[in-house]
From Swiss-Prot:
The gene is Chrm3. Residues 323-356 are annotated as: Disordered. Coiled coil: none annotated. InterPro entries: GPCR_Rhodpsn, GPCR_Rhodpsn_7TM, Musac_Ach_M3_rcpt, Musac_Ach_rcpt. It comes from Rattus norvegicus (Rat). Pfam families: 7tm_1. Its main location: membrane. This is Muscarinic acetylcholine receptor M3.
Length: 589
């Protein structure tokens, strides 16, 4: 924000020297005497007139109703600005859900807006009403320093928010790993330090750099911005350039969000088609409890390989094998949810040398090398149980310890129609991974080993259902992530739009004043400068409109419902704790 030197100048008094048009001979005095007296009288009369004008009219030439209207309007806006930004700061303090990295930037922006509401708005209103600066040169320089540092910090914070949103969407893996609160604090600190270094020293000490103060008494503006060309240059650096950068970044954010929305829609459609198969083999033939032979395809070993790792917690009551239950598990896709079990998925990259042991308690681990991420996204059919791949390195024998004894591996099922045992032994041909340097078929066949692991039809069915559940979880996580990104983008768009609307009129006048310094009335300068302040009033409204958490927290604070909210939160946590203990089996604790 650039305060133009003509925006609040005291009225000029032309034609003061018109009474001195007579020649020296008419006055009967020497030329030098008349000139000296005339000069003295002109300056004395001018000074007395100005002094009498300013001291006798503290309202600056305004009527009482004009003063009341200006004071009421600006005072109301200042009060709303102060209350709104205090609400943002307090909401960030009391609500842990708001303590995200993105909201740290909004907190910094709220602090800058609060400074403007407390100091800048009120002093500038006094300056407008009195039509002169009556607080002295030091107070003038301090006000301008605080005003410009806070305003520039707001712009810098908007730039930081824009870049943060842009990198979060375009580089989600690399940038978000480094996106911590500590790093956010460093960026916020840099924004404030840069703003302070750019404006405060120049405003406070420029008169000492040039050797004199050129700002007239009763006026308050930045001395080095008295030239329109310099004023326009600062407007380019402080407004036009940041707005251009933020607009470009927001456009890129919008395009990337639309692209990810389309990808998510395709992923959801793919998942729906896969679930519609209801675990029927692609050939159309139903499967019984016969044995399957699952053979792993030979793959090259890479330095790091990703596995889908799942952990199951089974209670004893949910594991009663019978023919009816086998049929029910085979035909119904909801039986997975009916079991008293919980599953958690984590995607982790493990090195080839990492040894993963299997649990021999009620909790046991199954490590399946599921299809790659890209294939999950692009394919519409999940692989059948024949195509399930098992890693020989990470999948050992699966041991399940029941209450009194361990389940023993059983032989393959015979010609009977019904399943009589819990598990059947399924031969699995496992091929150890081949080193990247060995590409010939001879070397590959030499490294192959064969192992037999206990695996039943029910295990294959559960694995397939887990694959579907995994896909559903991936889709859900992507959908939730996209929703959060859209909310953050909406908040950014609202803040950016408010910034452009409130700051553009004044900076357009700065551009016009460069070519025509008398084309813009003083009243327009005052309105344009005050409109820049209104941006600090609008920002908290943007947070509330675009963020439900901010909105509910504001409502809670305004209605003094903090205690009720804490009680509800404690009750919710207690209920969740009870549900968690019910789900986790006692032997797993």
């Amino acid at each position: 924000m650039t305060l133009h030197s003509n925006s609040t100048t005291s009225p000029l008094f032309p034609n003061i020297s018109s009474s001195w048009v007579h020649s020296p001979s008419e006055a009967g005095l020497p030329l030098g005497t008349v000139t000296q007296l005339g000069s003295y009288n002109i300056s004395q009369e001018t000074g007395n007139f100005s002094s009498n004008d300013t001291s006798s009219d503290p309202l600056g030439g305004h009527t009482i109703w004009q003063v009341v209207f200006i004071a009421f309007l600006t005072g109301f806006l200042a009060l709303v600005t102060i209350i709104g930004n205090i609400l943002v700061i307090v909401a960030f303090k009391v609500n842990k859900q708001l303590k995200t990295v993105n909201n740290y930037f909004l907190l910094s922006l709220a602090c800058a807006d609060l400074i403007i509401g407390v100091i800048s708005m009120n002093l500038f209103t006094t300056y407008i009403i009195m039509n002169r600066w009556a607080l002295g040169n030091l107070a003038c320089d301090l006000w301008l320093s605080i005003d410009y540092v806070a305003s520039n910090a707001s712009v810098m914070n908007l730039l930081v928010i824009s870049f943060d949103r842009y990198f979060s969407i375009t580089r989600p893996l690399t940038y978000r790993a480094k996106r911590t609160t500590k790093r956010a604090g460093v960026m916020i600190g840099l924004a404030w330090v840069i703003s302070f270094v750019l404006w405060a020293p120049a405003i406070l000490f420029w008169q000492y750099f040039v050797g004199k103060r050129t700002v007239p008494p009763g006026e308050c503006f930045i001395q080095f911005l008295s030239e329109p060309t310099i004023t326009f240059g600062t407007a380019i650096a402080a407004f036009y350039m940041p707005v251009t950068i933020m607009t470009i970044l927001y456009w890129r954010i919008y395009k990337e969000t639309e692209k990810r929305t389309k990808e998510l829609a395709g992923l959801q459609a793919s998942g729906t088609e896969a679930e519609a198969e209801n675990f029927v083999h692609p050939t159309g033939s139903s499967r019984s409890c016969s044995s399957y032979e699952l053979q792993q395809q030979g793959v090259k070993r890479s330095s790091r390989r990703k596995y889908g790792r799942c952990h199951f917690w089974f209670t004893t009551k949910s594991w009663k094998p019978s023919a009816e239950q086998m049929d029910q598990d085979h035909s119904s896709s909801d039986s997975w949810n009916n079991n008293d079990a919980a599953a958690s998925l984590e995607n982790s990259a493990s090195s080839d040398e990492e040894d993963i042991g299997s649990e021999t308690r009620a909790i046991y681990s199954i490590v399946l090398k599921l299809p790659g991420h890209s294939s999950i996204l692009n394919s519409t059919k999940l692989p059948s149980s024949d195509n399930l791949q098992v890693s020989n390195e990470d999948l050992g024998t699966v041991d399940v310890e029941r209450n009194a004894h361990k389940l023993q591996a059983q032989k393959s099922m015979g010609d009977g129609d019904n399943c009589q045992k819990d598990f059947t032994k399924l031969p699995i041909q496992l091929e150890s991974a081949v080193d990247t340097g060995k590409t010939s078929d001879t070397n590959s066949s030499a490294d192959k080993t064969t192992a037999t692991l206990p695996l039943s039809f029910k295990e294959a069915t559960l694995a397939k259902r887990f694959a579907l559940k995994t896909r559903s979880q991936i889709t859900k996580r992507k959908r939730m992530s996209l929703i959060k990104e859209k909310k953050a983008a909406q908040t950014l768009s609202a803040i950016l739009l408010a910034f452009i609307i409130t700051w553009t009129p004044y900076n357009i006048m700065v551009l016009v004043n460069t070519f025509c310094d008398s084309c813009i009335p003083k009243t327009y300068w005052n309105l344009g400068y005050w409109l820049c302040y209104i941006n600090s009033t609008v920002n908290p409204v943007c947070y509330a409109l675009c963020n439900k958490t901010f909105r509910t927290t504001f409502k809670t604070l305004l209605l003094c419902q903090c205690d009720k909210r804490k009680r509800r939160k404690q009750q919710y946590q207690q209920r969740q704790s009870v549900i968690f203990h019910k789900r986790v089996p006692e032997q797993a604790l």
